[in-house]
Regions:
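Flexible "arm" and connector segments at domain edges
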Residues: 1-60, 64-105
Length: 105
């Protein structure tokens, strides 16, 4: 992996997280950061399962921040990735909203 550099566009959430944490996250490395991300996903799962509405905002924020950090550590612009994949609608049927015949979960 290349040295840490800011990849999030100016004004983006990813850039904000880079400005706050990039040096520390780069020192920890992608593998260590991935472990923190997985832990936060676990906390989000727990809040959802327990229907802890008061914790959802915090846990979603944490997961979003750690995901942005992981993208940055890999030199990827998270917003550009999302727009590339979903900017034209559903990646499978290309419709907005999706018209795929997905079975109900």
């Amino acid at each position: 992996m290349s040295p840490a550099r800011r990849v999030g566009p100016e004004g983006s959430f990813q850039r904000l997280i880079e400005d706050i944490y990039l040096e520390r996250d780069a020192a920890r490395g992608a593998q260590g950061t991935l472990l923190w991300f997985v832990e936060e996903v676990g906390e989000l799962v727990r809040a959802i399962r327990r229907q802890e509405r008061h914790n959802l905002e915090e846990e979603f924020g944490d997961v979003y921040a750690w995901l942005a950090t992981l993208a940055s550590l890999h030199g990827l612009d998270l917003d550009a990735i999302g727009r590339k994949k979903y900017g034209g609608g559903c990646p499978r049927c290309r419709a907005v909203p999706c018209n795929c015949p997905h079975p109900a979960a």
